[in-house]
């Protein structure tokens, strides 16, 4: 039986060079087939979905018009880059997206020449593009540089810093604003398309440039008035561009990002411009072409595997509550008792559990957009006035507000409460989203209480502890995903500051855990017992202030002391070692070891596989104990067998 391909034209395209050989009338078919291939691929792998479907026509048009990879194409964030990957020689691997050894879910320089700049965090594309444009100019090059940025990413200050700089430099940079929420201005029919084409065309630009040159020879008052008349006339006919024009960009748009008859001529005109910078305002729809995603953009922003026919996602029934939900529910309970408790998120309400708080206390919830710097100092201002702000931000994104943590929070000892979600390794999103560094970058700061929850019940108590801390900032870190299924307390009870807890008493080996590796410590202790080694287990709870009494007790009563954490070098283990060194406890026979994440950026995989590769699972802990004893782990396992 003969089978026919659903994507016959796309099948002929291995690189954008093949795409550019096609007739313009064929580009529509390529886009339709590219959308189908994107849907089919993501249904198998899961991943970011809605944004990619929204830029299928734009992606096709850019690669058709511009000479990529010679022309540099930078995607902000990278959520929308799956169609780009399919067109740029990676279609044969597209069903390995976000799996171990497979394609990254974001653009990645080491993956393809068509990815000139890696991305995953928001609002970096214009800065990177400007750097590349200036490098081109200094080198005497002629290639184009295109940065594609979404309207959501435009809420971050970095994007405007870059635009301000680009406008002042008059650099020939092309910025395409992918407005998929129509938050700036919608395209209004044929007139909008006509004007966009007119204003991007050579005739209009030549007349405009000639008028500018003439204006230089006119009296200043007349020249300024003429300039304002021109700006007013464009602004009157083309709503939405005033801000960008003020920043020094030549604004074109808004145009329908799904209409290739509008996109292609405008992009060709922009490509041929000899001056810059230029901003092309393109309006798109998230989830375009897949009805379930069009109807529910938020639910299809990121998906697990799903059935293409129905849109039903294959979500497994949870065995325990997710940490983010435990945080949100705990915060609600605390806020019911204390009207000073407020919640803050930086464009991640559902990811952090702040959405749960928002349903109960909408007026006490603040989503500040992709603006972590602002979020931290905004929280500091609330704290200065006696409120109890909880700033819920992923570990990897909190890095973006570090100076504000130091300068605006810690130096002033303001009681901002940081809820650090996605601490440790996060799996499919890989190195760009791993919460590896907060133990290290917060641990060096004075005036900070630092906690890590070993399970979901501990998180409830730590939220209550943060509410009670009113004289300094505090943080609690917890991972992505489900808890352990432990018995949950009805209400949180504030913990004694700087005090850990003993979980199991042993004799020879002490395992001191900070965070959710505690479960692996318990498995390791059971395995060590099978080898005749008695192990104590302690849950540190606090990195700062450190439970010095507990640390000294473990060091004095055991031959081996091992710290375990889900963080980089310079974190919890370093604090324990420094304290023991200062106490002279490392001068004698104690065998002290620190288990941390490897000093590298780990590629994406499942969290379990990543932790195993890092040696931070039960097997890795047992291996570390045998190494400290000078024994061969493999040989010991064989003996037991």
Curated annotation (Swiss-Prot):
EC annotation from Swiss-Prot or TrEMBL: 2.2.1.7
Reaction equation(s) it catalyzes: D-glyceraldehyde 3-phosphate + pyruvate + H(+) = 1-deoxy-D-xylulose 5-phosphate + CO2
Entry keyword set: Isoprene biosynthesis, Magnesium, Metal-binding, Thiamine biosynthesis, Thiamine pyrophosphate, Transferase
Enzyme class: transferase
Binding site for thiamine diphosphate: 79, 120-122, 152-153, 180, 290, 372
Sample GO molecular function, one term: 1-deoxy-D-xylulose-5-phosphate synthase activity
Pathway: Metabolic intermediate biosynthesis; 1-deoxy-D-xylulose 5-phosphate biosynthesis; 1-deoxy-D-xylulose 5-phosphate from D-glyceraldehyde 3-phosphate and pyruvate: step 1/1
Manner of cofactor binding, per the entry note: Binds 1 Mg(2+) ion per subunit. Binds 1 thiamine pyrophosphate per subunit.
Domain of life: Bacteria
Required cofactor(s): Mg(2+); thiamine diphosphate
Record CDD domains: TPP_DXS, TPP_PYR_DXS_TK_like
InterPro entries: Dxylulose-5-P_synthase, THDP-binding, Transketo_C/PFOR_II, Transketolase-like_Pyr-bd, Transketolase_BS, Transketolase_C, Transketolase_CS
Range of residues in the leader sequence: none
GO biological process: 1-deoxy-D-xylulose 5-phosphate biosynthetic process; glyceraldehyde-3-phosphate metabolic process; terpenoid biosynthetic process; thiamine biosynthetic process
Binding residues for Mg(2+): 151, 180
Purpose of the protein: Catalyzes the acyloin condensation reaction between C atoms 2 and 3 of pyruvate and glyceraldehyde 3-phosphate to yield 1-deoxy-D-xylulose-5-phosphate (DXP).
Family: Belongs to the transketolase family. DXPS subfamily.
Subunit structure: Homodimer.
Protein name: 1-deoxy-D-xylulose-5-phosphate synthase
């Amino acid at each position: 039986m003969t089978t026919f391909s659903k994507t016959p034209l796309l099948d002929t395209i291995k690189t954008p060079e093949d795409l550019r050989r096609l007739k313009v009338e064929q580009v529509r078919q390529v886009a339709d087939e590219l959308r189908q291939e994107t849907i089919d691929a993501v249904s198998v792998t899961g991943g970011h979905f809605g944004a990619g479907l929204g830029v299928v026509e734009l992606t096709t048009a850019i690669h058709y018009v511009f000479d990529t990879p010679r022309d540099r194409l930078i995607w902000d964030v990278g959520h929308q880059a799956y169609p780009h990957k399919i067109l740029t020689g990676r279609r044969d691997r597209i069903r390995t997206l976000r799996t171990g050894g497979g394609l990254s879910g974001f653009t990645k320089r080491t993956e393809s020449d068509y990815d000139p700049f890696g991305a995953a965090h928001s609002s970096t594309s214009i800065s990177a593009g400007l750097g590349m444009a200036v490098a081109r100019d200094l080198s005497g090059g002629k290639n184009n540089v295109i940065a594609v940025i979404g309207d959501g990413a435009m809420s971050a200050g970095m994007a405007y810093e870059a635009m301000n700089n680009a406008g002042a430099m008059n650099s020939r940079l092309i910025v395409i604003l992918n407005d998929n929420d129509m938050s700036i201005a919608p395209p209004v029919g044929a007139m909008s398309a006509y004007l966009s084409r007119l204003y991007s065309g050579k005739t209009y630009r030549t007349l405009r440039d000639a008028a500018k040159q003439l204006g230089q020879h006119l009296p200043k008052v007349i020249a300024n008035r003429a300039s304002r008349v021109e700006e007013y006339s464009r602004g009157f006919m083309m709503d939405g561009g005033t801000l960008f024009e003020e920043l020094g960009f030549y604004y074109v748009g808004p145009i329908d990002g799904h209409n290739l008859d509008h996109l292609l001529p405008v992009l060709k005109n922009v490509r041929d411009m000899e001056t810059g910078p230029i901003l092309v305002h393109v309006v798109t729809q998230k989830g375009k072409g897949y009805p379930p995603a069009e109807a529910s953009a938020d639910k299809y922003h990121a998906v697990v595997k799903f059935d293409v026919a129905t849109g039903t996602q294959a979500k497994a029934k949870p065995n325990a509550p997710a940490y983010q939900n435990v945080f949100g529910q705990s915060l609600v309970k605390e806020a019911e008792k204390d009207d000073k408790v407020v919640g803050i998120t930086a464009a991640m309400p559902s990811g952090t559990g702040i959405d749960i708080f928002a349903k109960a206390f909408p007026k006490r919830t603040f989503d500040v957009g992709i603006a972590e710097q602002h979020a931290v100092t905004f929280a500091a201002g609330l704290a200065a006035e006696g409120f109890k702000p909880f700033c819920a931000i992923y570990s990897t994104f909190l890095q973006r507000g570090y100076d504000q943590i130091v300068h605006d929070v810690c130096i002033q000892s303001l009681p901002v409460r940081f809820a650090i979600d996605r601490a440790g390794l996060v799996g499919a999103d890989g190195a760009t989203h791993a919460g590896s560094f907060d133990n290290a970058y917060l641990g060096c700061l004075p005036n900070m209480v630092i906690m890590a929850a070993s399970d979901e019940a501990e998180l409830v108590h730590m939220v209550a502890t943060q509410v009670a801390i009113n004289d300094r900032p505090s943080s609690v870190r917890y991972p992505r995903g489900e808890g352990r299924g432990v018995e949950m307390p009805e209400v949180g009870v504030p913990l004694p500051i700087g005090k850990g807890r003993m979980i199991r008493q042993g004799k020879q080996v002490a395992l001191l855990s900070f965070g959710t590796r505690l479960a692996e410590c318990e498995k390791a202790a059971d395995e060590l017992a099978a080898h005749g080694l008695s192990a104590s287990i302690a849950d540190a709870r606090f990195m700062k202030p450190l439970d010095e009494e507990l640390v000294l007790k473990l060091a004095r009563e055991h031959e081996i002391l091992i710290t375990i954490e889900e963080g980089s070098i310079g974190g919890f283990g370093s604090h324990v070692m420094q304290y023991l060194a200062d106490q002279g406890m490392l001068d004698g026979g104690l065998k002290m070891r620190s288990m941390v994440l490897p000093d590298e950026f780990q590629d994406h995989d499942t969290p379990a596989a990543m932790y195993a590769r890092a040696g931070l699972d039960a097997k890795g802990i047992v291996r570390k104990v045998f190494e400290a004893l000078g024994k061969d782990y493999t040989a010991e396992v064989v003996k037991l067998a």
